[in-house]
Every structure is written in structure tokens, then in C-alpha cells.
Amino acid sequence: MGEAEKFHYIYSCDLDINVQLKIGSLEGKREQKSYKAVLEDPMLKFSGLYQETCSDLYVTCQVFAEGKPLALPVRTSYKAFSTRWNWNEWLKLPVKYPDLPRNAQVALTIWDVYGPGKAVPVGGTTVSLFGKYGMFRQGMHDLKVWPNVEADGSEPTKTPGRTSSTLSEDQMSRLAKLTKAHRQGHMVKVDWLDRLTFREIEMINESEKRSSNFMYLMVEFRCVKCDDKEYGIVYYEKDGDESSPILTSFELVKVPDPQMSMENLVESKHHKLARSLRSGPSDHDLKPNAATRDQLNIIVSYPPTKQLTYEEQDLVWKFRYYLTNQEKALTKFLKCVNWDLPQEAKQALELLGKWKPMDVEDSLELLSSHYTNPTVRRYAVARLRQADDEDLLMYLLQLVQALKYENFDDIKNGLEPTKKDSQSSVSENVSNSGINSAEIDSSQIITSPLPSVSSPPPASKTKEVPDGENLEQDLCTFLISRACKNSTLANYLYWYVIVECEDQDTQQRDPKTHEMYLNVMRRFSQALLKGDKSVRVMRSLLAAQQTFVDRLVHLMKAVQRESGNRKKKNERLQALLGDNEKMNLSDVELIPLPLEPQVKIRGIIPETATLFKSALMPAQLFFKTEDGGKYPVIFKHGDDLRQDQLILQIISLMDKLLRKENLDLKLTPYKVLATSTKHGFMQFIQSVPVAEVLDTEGSIQNFFRKYAPSENGPNGISAEVMDTYVKSCAGYCVITYILGVGDRHLDNLLLTKTGKLFHIDFGYILGRDPKPLPPPMKLNKEMVEGMGGTQSEQYQEFRKQCYTAFLHLRRYSNLILNLFSLMVDANIPDIALEPDKTVKKVQDKFRLDLSDEEAVHYMQSLIDESVHALFAAVVEQIHKFAQYWRK
């Protein structure tokens, strides 16, 4: 083989030098802008398009692979042009040959000046660095320039310099291929003929460029020569063909970070300088400008779950004196304080007393686990003292949970000292009963007489201070002092604390919290015992309630042990209730009903007691009231009612908030009280499941026409009943959506003869649902037909009520979120699954990121989606068949 026929090459991985590229000339004409364009855009006067001579263009070059840049761009140096653009400059790219992947391409963009500090692209072109056979490009190349765009480095590129049409059709491409073949030695070289040929080729190329509508950029790739021999650069990657083993299992290698969890000295120094005492006097008179004021207003409007950035914290601290007139800003300010720094904490506490008093509902946030400073928590208690008993009752369930974040030692120190002999007798009784001191039956604390008090405790120890404008009361002391003044508060406080004392999970998982609740119950019992006659009577009534509930639990256990069907169990239930000597439940001394202490009961009517068709067979009981009436309840044994209790409390609160806004949605927030983790009471509302209504009457409207007919009303139904139905539907649709209530079917939607629709059975909340693809809210075809269909006036009213209710509840979102934040550590099933996400789930339903108008449109889309949910209708039919086969 002759020397000329040999192919000399070098691998790209062995050529450890930077890639070089020569920018030659730019051929073609730029489209001139009209005078009209100059009038519309005066900045064109500064661009090259407005110049008579060639403008001062420059070229940038950047290497891309897979749409991502491999290095920073480089650009040509400044050069003044007169008649043609000719840079004739070699650019050294910041990437080496071994670093180039097979699909590397270079993007070239030509730029023109367009006003001060601004440039616009004249055009761009892209060309791959390796040919289709893996050879690095060499020699001269005319690249087609795509006008008015930057070069595109993605794959496939939108600005190809060598398009398919130019490679196969035009004269320039054909000549370029022949030139390449000549350069590679595939043609016989004749010097005199080659000179004539190349001159003719240049003339043809010039003619083609002038006749074309495109511009062309000439670039040259470096040739590699050694000993007068030209070498081609072939793409090659060492070990590129070797297969890489895929590990099916691996071990985590933990690398210790010596600086992990250590203090960031720079941030700490900045924090201390920003919060130093020296800045205090100067910050006192600071007033924000309009932009800063708007930013502060945005920060203040954040929901309680929002974490402030360091910049936002510094801004709030800087203008803390300005914000003292805004009560809503206090919680945001307290979030900015580093309580580990004594000077900063001292400044914050001094400012706390000067701040405009916050609203009672906002103070609940200060009782969450995020605020541990005792002064801040006592400030929140001081604000709670401004709430009346009715409002306090709405928050009492959460306030009992907030005791978990109090100082347990302070609660224990509030216990009054007793005589040694009495203490020893109590300990002896406990030891003789075989019960561990940590497992004392909490009900015994209130039912057993307490030993006498030896002497008044020191002032420093007692927490039973009179209500006043001070920060002396902690949360435990406050709750006990208010409960001693109101029998209803005392009733619910007792049962809420009893449930926590008897929670076996808490006792095993967190013994300190369990002991704390026992101490709360002991202090409550002491406070009741040392009160006046009416307070001591209150204590005896609570003891009587506990005894009554214990007997009722004993009765339910006896009924459940009874063999036989439901009829036999019913007979056994009525027989045991009638045996007053054995059970003593049908005729007792007058006591408050634990479920609703305003109702005084004398016992249970035996002959009316029945068991429901259910796995746990809850009992429907009718209590004899003081005035001779009947009060129906459901007593469940073997079921934890705390989740239902929470949801009904929130529904009751929402009903109160909506009524406060003059919006009565005819809700039915029936009462639920857990008397233990295994049993409790539910108020019974005379009603019919919607599924039964549809089976017996055919439709909801037929049901209403049967019990509330009216010739003048809509569809022959009383206007008042229809209005009640529409409003209750709207209220529960919005509320169950916000609370994420799941497992909705027509058997747990109940309907009264007065038109009230309401939900029961809240075993799935916060987005949990046993059914796949549930709709956002329970609103099916039958419910809409009960209003008269989607075209009826009642349905349009329903939609309006939904919008109004949603907007009102959004304004109280902080209160609702604060209540849920206090429940994150409660042993409630659907909260315990993901306690850290509980508040976020509720917050997401409020869509606080939307304006009121956007929120209305969002609610519209939810209603439409729910009405037309096809899969939900299929699931409802499956549930209906399942219920049929169970029967």
C-alpha cells in the first residue's frame, strides 16, 4: 500500500489539548429596518441595522451536549468593520478533546449592539463537532445562519448549520464534498489544475451566497499534522465498550461530616449584630417605606404554619417597634426570636408587654409545641382569660392537649402538700390493690375523698391566683380555676382529662405525659374539694357521673357476653336495665348527663333500650330528664370516639363562626363525648339514612312531599324545608371537603323530616378514604335531584351558599389551623398516621394562595367535578349491593 493511501489518525482521548475554532467571515445581507420601525422603536438608532457601513458584530461560541452546555461561552475580540464582516480569529474553547462526548456540538451566535448594555442576536448556527462516522471535523465550513435567533444547543437543534436540503441539493454542498475528498487524498493532486479549480469553487460559492436569502458564517476547524502527515481525529473513549455491572444490592457508605450540626459562625455573627442592644434605640423610630410596608403586611398575613426565612425574620425584628400596633404581628415577631440568647429573649419579653393585645383565638398558637418560653405561654393564658365560658368551651378539647407542651414540673409543684400519714395511707391502699403508682385508676382520684390540707401552700408554689392582668397563671391553673366557676366547663374538663389518663398507648409510650395528666386530675380534685359548697357539690356530681358510666360499661359487657342473636341481646339489655338492685341505672339520683351537662337525668328507661345492627352493637338509650322528658343517646362500647368527637367539635365551631357572619346553614352538630378510649356517648338525632329514603320513597323530593307537603312551595314541598335542605347540603359539602372526610356513602348521610341533611361516622378524615378515586365532596345525582336538578333555582342557591361558606371559613382559617396544630400529638387514628402533615392537609384545602374571586372559581370546579363523578356513582352501587348481601 502506498504512503498516500494510508489513513493516519489519532484518538480524541489521547489529544490532551483545547479545541480551537477559527471564525472567518460572514457573507450575506441583513434585512434593513424601515423608518416606521425606527419610529416605533427608537433604540434601533443605536443598533447596527441603522448604520450605513457594516456594524460592529461579534460572535460567541459554546459547546453543548444533550442540550446542556459543557463550558462557558467564548467570544471574538472587538473589531471595526467597513465593507464586510471578516474576523479571521482563532478561538480557544475551554474544553479539551478527551472531554468531548460523541454528540458534542458547537453553537455559534452572532450579536449586534442594541442600545446601552444590551445586545440582540443577528443569527445563530449549530454544527456537530464529530461527523457521522466519528471523525472530528477539519477544514473550512460554510454554516447557514438562522436569522434573529440565538444558536440552539439542544438535540435536535433548531438552528442546524448543515441542513438536509443543503447537503443533497445545492451546488455549495456538492463542491464541499468534493473538496473534502481532495483533501483526504481520494483524488489525484495536480498543482496547476488544483489552483484553477479552487479559485473557480470560491467564485461559485460567492455567487451562491449572494443569490441566497440566508447569511453564511465561514468557520475553520484545526487540522492535526505531524511530520508533514495529516492526521484525522477519531472519537474514542477508553473502556467505553466495557459493560458496567449493575448492583442489585448495595451498602450505604456513611461519611462523617465533622461540621454537621455545628454552629455557622458567619450566620451567628450576623444574627447577633442584627439583634444587638445597640440597635434598639435606633430601631425604635424606624418607619418602613411603602415597599417594605407591603412586604411586612404579606408576612403578617402568612398562615401560622409558614416558616419565615432568615431575611423575613430580620425584617420583622428591624421594624418590631413599628409592628407593636398590629396584634396579628405578635406571633410572627415571637417566631423571629432566638430564645437561647438571653439578651434577645429579654428584649422580646419587654416588648411583649408593650404589644397591642392579640385576639383570643390567635393566642392559641402560642400554646403549641413551637413556643416553649414560659412567659410567652402565660401571656397566651392571660389572653384566654378574656374569653367567655362559651368560647372557652369551644377550645377546651385542644387546651387539654396543649397541657402536653407545658412544664410538667410546674404542674406537679401545683399539688398541695398533704399530711404524711394521709400520704402513707394512700400509698398503702395503692400498693395493697396491686396497682403500680404510675397506673392509678384516674377515676379513683375524683371519686375517693382526699385527705385534708395541712396548711396553705407557700405563695411561690401555689398557682391558684385570682384572675387579673398578670402572667402568673400557667395553662393548668387557668383551666382548673375556670372549671371551678362553671359546672359545664368542669364536666368536659373532667372527661377530657380522664380519657388522657386512661390512654394505655400514652402510658406505655410516654409515661411522663401520663403522669402529668394524673397530676392535673389530682389538682382538679383538690381545687374542687377546697372550694365552697357549690364547688364541692360539683365534685360529688362528677363522682356520681363516673360511677354511673362504670355501671353502664359493666352492663354493656354483660350484654356482649350474652350468646344468641340481636333479639336475645335486646331482651337481656332491657332485663338488666330493669333490675335496679343489680345495676342501679333505671332510677338514680339527679345527675348531669356527661354528654350535655345542662340536661339533668334520673336514669334510663329500660323498655325503650335497643341495640343497633352493627358489629359492635351500640345501644340506643332514652334517659329520663328532670322535667319528665326523654333524651335519646347512643352508647358505644368497644369503639374509640375521640376522632368523631374532634370532627363534631370542629363542625360545631364552624357553625358558630358562620352564624357570627349571619350565615345559618342549618347544620346538625350533634354532641359526642368519649368517656374512655373504648366507650362514649353520642347524641341521637331522629333521622333516616338517605339510602333508606331512596329505597322506600324513590327520591328525596318524594320524602319531603310526604312529610312536608305544600301546594305553594317548590315541587309541592314546603319552602322552609327545601331551604333547610339546600343550606344543610351546602354547609356539609364545604365542611367535609375542608376536613377531608372520607368513606362517604348514602348510609352515613342522614335526613330529617324538617329538611336537615347531616353526616355521621367520621372514621376517615384528612383525605383518607377506603374507596378509590373519591370525589372532592359528597354530592351525588340523587342529592342534586332533591333540589330540583342542576337547572333549578334551588341548585343555583346551593352553589351560592357553598361559595359564601367557603369564603367565610377561609377568613377563620388561622383559628382552625391553630386548633389542629394543638391536636398533632393527640392519639387520634388519622392524625397519628402523619402528625407532621396534619395541619398542612387542612391548610391545603383552604387554598390560601388564591384570592377570594379565584377561590370561588375553585369551589365551582369542585362542585362540578363532584356532581359529574362517574366512578363515585359506580362505587356507590357496589356499596349498595354489599349492604344488600350483608342483610
Curated annotation (Swiss-Prot):
Domain PI3K/PI4K catalytic per the UniProt entry, residue ranges: 605-871
InterPro entries in the record: ARM-type_fold, C2_domain_sf, Kinase-like_dom_sf, PI3/4_kinase_cat_dom, PI3/4_kinase_cat_sf, PI3/4_kinase_CS, PI3K-type_C2_dom, PI3K_accessory_dom
SUPFAM superfamilies the record matches: ARM repeat, C2 domain (Calcium/lipid-binding domain, CaLB), Protein kinase-like (PK-like)
Localization (cell): Midbody; Late endosome; Cytoplasmic vesicle, Autophagosome
Domain C2 PI3K-type, first and last residues per copy: 35-184
Residue ranges, annotated region (G-loop): 611-617
Residue list for modification Phosphothreonine: 163
Pfam families linked to this entry: PI3_PI4_kinase, PI3K_C2, PI3Ka
Region (Disordered): 149-170, 447-467
Domain PIK helical: 283-520
UniProt EC number: 2.7.1.137
UniProt enzyme class: transferase
Cofactor(s) needed: Mn(2+)
Tissue distribution: Ubiquitously expressed, with a highest expression in skeletal muscle.
Gene Ontology CC terms: autolysosome; autophagosome; axoneme; cytoplasm; cytosol; endosome; GABA-ergic synapse; glutamatergic synapse
Residue spans crossing the bilayer: none
Signal sequence bounds: none
Family classification: Belongs to the PI3/PI4-kinase family.
Free-text function comment from the UniProt entry: Catalytic subunit of the PI3K complex that mediates formation of phosphatidylinositol 3-phosphate; different complex forms are believed to play a role in multiple membrane trafficking pathways: PI3KC3-C1 is involved in initiation of autophagosomes and PI3KC3-C2 in maturation of autophagosomes and endocytosis. As part of PI3KC3-C1, promotes endoplasmic reticulum membrane curvature formation prior to vesicle budding. Involved in regulation of degradative endocytic trafficking and required for the abscission step in cytokinesis, probably in the context of PI3KC3-C2.
UniProt subunit comment: Component of the PI3K (PI3KC3/PI3K-III/class III phosphatidylinositol 3-kinase) complex the core of which is composed of the catalytic subunit PIK3C3, the regulatory subunit PIK3R4 and BECN1 associating with additional regulatory/auxiliary subunits to form alternative complex forms. Alternative complex forms containing a fourth regulatory subunit in a mutually exclusive manner are: the PI3K complex I (PI3KC3-C1) containing ATG14, and the PI3K complex II (PI3KC3-C2) containing UVRAG.
Protein name: Phosphatidylinositol 3-kinase catalytic subunit type 3
Native source species: Homo sapiens
Lineage: Eukaryota, Metazoa, Chordata, Craniata, Vertebrata
Protein's gene: PIK3C3
